[in-house]
Protein backbone atom coordinates (compact mmCIF):
# COMPACT_ATOMS: atom_id res chain seq x y z
CA UNK A 1 0.00 0.00 0.00
CA UNK A 2 2.83 2.37 0.85
CA UNK A 3 4.47 1.64 -2.50
CA UNK A 4 1.19 2.36 -4.26
CA UNK A 5 0.79 5.69 -2.46
CA UNK A 6 4.39 6.58 -3.28
CA UNK A 7 3.83 5.79 -6.96
CA UNK A 8 0.63 7.86 -6.99
CA UNK A 9 2.42 10.80 -5.36
CA UNK A 10 5.30 10.49 -7.80
CA UNK A 11 2.87 10.26 -10.71
CA UNK A 12 1.03 13.40 -9.58
CA UNK A 13 4.32 15.27 -9.22
CA UNK A 14 5.41 14.21 -12.69
CA UNK A 15 2.08 15.30 -14.16
CA UNK A 16 2.41 18.75 -12.55
CA UNK A 17 5.99 19.05 -13.80
CA UNK A 18 4.83 18.07 -17.30
CA UNK A 19 2.19 20.82 -17.29
CA UNK A 20 4.71 23.42 -16.09
CA UNK A 21 7.25 22.45 -18.75
CA UNK A 22 4.48 22.45 -21.36
CA UNK A 23 3.56 26.01 -20.36
CA UNK A 24 7.22 27.06 -20.56
CA UNK A 25 7.45 25.56 -24.04
CA UNK A 26 4.42 27.61 -25.05
CA UNK A 27 5.93 30.81 -23.61
CA UNK A 28 9.35 30.25 -25.21
CA UNK A 29 7.64 29.30 -28.47
CA UNK A 30 5.74 32.59 -28.42
CA UNK A 31 8.94 34.52 -27.68
CA UNK A 32 10.59 32.69 -30.58
CA UNK A 33 7.75 33.77 -32.86
CA UNK A 34 8.11 37.41 -31.77
CA UNK A 35 11.88 37.33 -32.29
CA UNK A 36 11.44 35.76 -35.73
CA UNK A 37 9.00 38.51 -36.72
CA UNK A 38 11.31 41.24 -35.41
CA UNK A 39 14.25 39.64 -37.22
CA UNK A 40 12.26 39.54 -40.46
CA UNK A 41 11.39 43.23 -40.05
CA UNK A 42 15.04 44.22 -39.49
CA UNK A 43 16.27 41.97 -42.29
CA UNK A 44 13.81 43.52 -44.73
CA UNK A 45 14.46 47.06 -43.49
CA UNK A 46 18.23 46.77 -43.94
CA UNK A 47 17.68 45.04 -47.26
CA UNK A 48 16.18 48.30 -48.54
CA UNK A 49 19.12 50.43 -47.39
CA UNK A 50 21.94 50.89 -49.91
CA UNK A 51 25.37 49.94 -48.55
CA UNK A 52 28.17 52.51 -48.79
CA UNK A 53 30.37 50.42 -51.13
CA UNK A 54 27.50 49.65 -53.55
CA UNK A 55 28.45 45.97 -53.74
CA UNK A 56 26.03 43.05 -54.03
CA UNK A 57 25.98 40.17 -51.59
CA UNK A 58 27.59 37.96 -54.23
CA UNK A 59 30.37 40.46 -54.95
CA UNK A 60 31.16 40.89 -51.27
CA UNK A 61 31.21 37.14 -50.61
CA UNK A 62 33.40 36.58 -53.66
CA UNK A 63 35.86 39.24 -52.49
CA UNK A 64 36.17 37.72 -49.01
CA UNK A 65 36.72 34.25 -50.46
CA UNK A 66 39.31 35.42 -52.99
CA UNK A 67 41.16 37.46 -50.37
CA UNK A 68 41.56 34.29 -48.30
CA UNK A 69 42.63 32.00 -51.15
CA UNK A 70 39.24 30.31 -51.46
CA UNK A 71 38.74 30.77 -55.20
CA UNK A 72 37.30 27.24 -55.51
CA UNK A 73 34.39 28.06 -53.20
CA UNK A 74 31.40 29.09 -55.31
CA UNK A 75 28.73 31.66 -54.51
CA UNK A 76 25.28 30.43 -55.50
CA UNK A 77 21.74 31.71 -55.24
CA UNK A 78 19.27 29.69 -53.20
CA UNK A 79 15.62 29.80 -52.25
CA UNK A 80 14.66 31.25 -48.88
CA UNK A 81 12.86 28.15 -47.58
CA UNK A 82 15.29 25.29 -48.04
CA UNK A 83 18.82 26.59 -47.56
CA UNK A 84 18.71 30.32 -46.81
CA UNK A 85 21.97 32.22 -46.38
CA UNK A 86 24.47 29.49 -45.54
CA UNK A 87 27.82 27.84 -46.19
CA UNK A 88 28.21 24.23 -47.29
CA UNK A 89 31.46 22.43 -46.47
CA UNK A 90 30.46 19.41 -48.56
CA UNK A 91 29.35 21.25 -51.69
CA UNK A 92 32.05 23.93 -51.34
CA UNK A 93 29.72 26.87 -51.80
CA UNK A 94 28.29 29.92 -50.10
CA UNK A 95 24.54 30.18 -50.62
CA UNK A 96 22.77 33.53 -50.62
CA UNK A 97 19.06 34.17 -50.93
CA UNK A 98 17.76 35.62 -54.18
CA UNK A 99 16.73 38.78 -52.35
CA UNK A 100 20.29 39.12 -51.02
CA UNK A 101 22.64 37.92 -53.73
CA UNK A 102 22.06 40.62 -56.35
CA UNK A 103 21.14 43.53 -54.07
CA UNK A 104 23.56 46.26 -52.99
CA UNK A 105 21.85 46.54 -49.62
CA UNK A 106 23.19 46.60 -46.07
CA UNK A 107 21.69 43.16 -45.45
CA UNK A 108 23.40 41.81 -48.56
CA UNK A 109 26.72 43.26 -47.39
CA UNK A 110 26.44 41.67 -43.95
CA UNK A 111 25.21 38.27 -45.12
CA UNK A 112 27.73 38.04 -47.94
CA UNK A 113 30.69 38.75 -45.66
CA UNK A 114 29.50 36.68 -42.70
CA UNK A 115 28.68 33.52 -44.66
CA UNK A 116 31.96 33.77 -46.56
CA UNK A 117 33.73 34.05 -43.20
CA UNK A 118 32.29 30.63 -42.30
CA UNK A 119 34.28 29.24 -45.24
CA UNK A 120 37.35 31.03 -43.88
CA UNK A 121 36.82 29.38 -40.47
CA UNK A 122 36.51 26.04 -42.27
CA UNK A 123 39.81 26.63 -44.09
CA UNK A 124 41.51 27.57 -40.81
CA UNK A 125 40.15 24.36 -39.23
CA UNK A 126 38.36 26.18 -36.44
CA UNK A 127 37.66 23.54 -33.73
CA UNK A 128 33.95 24.37 -33.36
CA UNK A 129 33.52 24.38 -37.13
CA UNK A 130 35.25 20.98 -37.40
CA UNK A 131 32.99 19.49 -34.72
CA UNK A 132 29.90 20.91 -36.39
CA UNK A 133 30.87 19.48 -39.78
CA UNK A 134 31.69 16.05 -38.32
CA UNK A 135 28.54 15.80 -36.27
CA UNK A 136 26.12 17.27 -38.74
CA UNK A 137 26.68 16.66 -42.46
CA UNK A 138 22.97 17.43 -42.86
CA UNK A 139 23.69 21.06 -41.87
CA UNK A 140 23.83 21.57 -45.63
CA UNK A 141 20.07 21.20 -45.80
CA UNK A 142 19.28 23.96 -43.35
CA UNK A 143 15.83 23.82 -41.74
CA UNK A 144 14.98 20.55 -43.53
CA UNK A 145 17.63 18.78 -41.46
CA UNK A 146 15.26 19.05 -38.48
CA UNK A 147 12.42 17.14 -40.21
CA UNK A 148 13.68 13.75 -38.89
CA UNK A 149 13.75 15.28 -35.40
CA UNK A 150 10.15 16.44 -35.73
CA UNK A 151 9.03 13.03 -37.07
CA UNK A 152 10.78 11.14 -34.30
CA UNK A 153 9.33 13.51 -31.71
CA UNK A 154 5.83 12.93 -33.07
CA UNK A 155 6.33 9.16 -33.13
CA UNK A 156 7.72 9.29 -29.59
CA UNK A 157 4.68 11.15 -28.29
CA UNK A 158 2.30 8.65 -29.94
CA UNK A 159 4.03 5.48 -28.82
CA UNK A 160 4.81 6.59 -25.28
CA UNK A 161 1.14 7.23 -24.63
CA UNK A 162 -0.23 4.32 -26.65
CA UNK A 163 2.29 1.53 -26.15
CA UNK A 164 4.23 0.01 -23.32
CA UNK A 165 7.33 -2.00 -22.54
CA UNK A 166 9.97 -2.14 -25.26
CA UNK A 167 8.36 0.59 -27.39
CA UNK A 168 8.68 3.11 -24.58
CA UNK A 169 12.36 2.34 -24.07
CA UNK A 170 13.35 2.14 -27.74
CA UNK A 171 11.41 5.10 -29.11
CA UNK A 172 11.93 7.09 -25.94
CA UNK A 173 15.69 6.61 -26.08
CA UNK A 174 15.77 7.35 -29.82
CA UNK A 175 13.75 10.51 -29.42
CA UNK A 176 15.89 11.76 -26.55
CA UNK A 177 19.07 11.12 -28.55
CA UNK A 178 17.70 13.25 -31.39
CA UNK A 179 16.94 16.12 -29.03
CA UNK A 180 20.38 15.95 -27.37
CA UNK A 181 21.93 15.81 -30.85
CA UNK A 182 19.99 18.91 -31.91
CA UNK A 183 20.96 20.84 -28.76
CA UNK A 184 24.68 20.09 -29.19
CA UNK A 185 24.56 21.12 -32.84
CA UNK A 186 22.65 24.30 -32.03
CA UNK A 187 25.34 25.29 -29.51
CA UNK A 188 28.10 24.61 -32.05
CA UNK A 189 26.21 26.54 -34.73
CA UNK A 190 25.82 29.52 -32.40
CA UNK A 191 29.55 29.50 -31.65
CA UNK A 192 30.63 29.32 -35.31
CA UNK A 193 28.11 31.94 -36.40
CA UNK A 194 29.33 34.36 -33.70
CA UNK A 195 32.95 33.77 -34.70
CA UNK A 196 32.08 34.45 -38.35
CA UNK A 197 30.25 37.62 -37.32
CA UNK A 198 33.30 38.92 -35.47
CA UNK A 199 35.49 38.11 -38.46
CA UNK A 200 33.03 39.95 -40.68
CA UNK A 201 33.18 43.11 -38.53
CA UNK A 202 37.00 43.05 -38.57
CA UNK A 203 37.12 42.49 -42.32
CA UNK A 204 34.68 45.30 -43.08
CA UNK A 205 36.63 47.69 -40.85
CA UNK A 206 40.05 46.77 -42.24
CA UNK A 207 38.86 47.05 -45.85
CA UNK A 208 36.92 50.27 -45.12
CA UNK A 209 33.80 48.66 -46.59
CA UNK A 210 31.33 49.82 -43.92
CA UNK A 211 30.73 52.98 -41.94
CA UNK A 212 30.45 53.00 -38.15
CA UNK A 213 26.69 53.37 -38.50
CA UNK A 214 26.47 50.41 -40.88
CA UNK A 215 28.52 48.24 -38.55
CA UNK A 216 26.20 49.12 -35.67
CA UNK A 217 23.15 48.18 -37.76
CA UNK A 218 24.76 44.87 -38.72
CA UNK A 219 25.54 44.16 -35.07
CA UNK A 220 21.86 44.73 -34.29
CA UNK A 221 20.82 42.34 -37.07
CA UNK A 222 23.23 39.59 -36.05
CA UNK A 223 22.35 40.08 -32.38
CA UNK A 224 18.78 39.11 -33.24
CA UNK A 225 20.04 36.02 -35.06
CA UNK A 226 22.05 35.04 -31.97
CA UNK A 227 19.06 35.57 -29.67
CA UNK A 228 17.04 33.33 -31.97
CA UNK A 229 19.73 30.63 -31.77
CA UNK A 230 19.78 30.85 -27.97
CA UNK A 231 15.98 30.73 -27.86
CA UNK A 232 16.01 27.61 -30.06
CA UNK A 233 18.51 25.94 -27.71
CA UNK A 234 16.27 26.71 -24.72
CA UNK A 235 13.22 25.42 -26.59
CA UNK A 236 14.97 22.19 -27.60
CA UNK A 237 16.13 21.70 -23.99
CA UNK A 238 12.58 22.14 -22.70
CA UNK A 239 11.28 19.70 -25.31
CA UNK A 240 13.93 17.22 -24.18
CA UNK A 241 12.80 17.62 -20.57
CA UNK A 242 9.15 17.32 -21.65
CA UNK A 243 9.84 13.99 -23.35
CA UNK A 244 11.84 12.72 -20.36
CA UNK A 245 8.81 13.47 -18.19
CA UNK A 246 6.52 11.73 -20.68
CA UNK A 247 8.62 8.59 -20.50
CA UNK A 248 8.81 8.76 -16.70
CA UNK A 249 5.02 9.08 -16.45
CA UNK A 250 4.48 6.17 -18.85
CA UNK A 251 6.90 3.96 -16.93
CA UNK A 252 5.35 4.96 -13.59
CA UNK A 253 1.89 4.05 -14.87
CA UNK A 254 3.24 0.75 -16.15
CA UNK A 255 4.74 -0.14 -12.78
CA UNK A 256 1.52 0.84 -10.98
CA UNK A 257 -0.46 -1.72 -12.99
CA UNK A 258 1.84 -4.56 -11.93
Residue ranges and their predicted role:
Residues 2-7, 36-142, 187-258:
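Polar-ligand-bearing catalytic/cofactor-coordination segments
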Residues 12-27, 159-177:
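Hydrophobic alpha-helical transmembrane segments
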Residues 121-127, 149-160:
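Membrane-helix exit/interface motif
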Residues 129-154, 170-174:
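Long, charge-patterned amphipathic alpha-helical coiled-coil/hairpin "stalk" segments used as oligomerization
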Residues 27-35, 176, 180-192:
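Hydrophobic alpha-helical membrane-associated segments
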Residues 17-26, 147-151, 239, 246:
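Alpha-helical transmembrane anchor segments and their immediate juxtamembrane flanks
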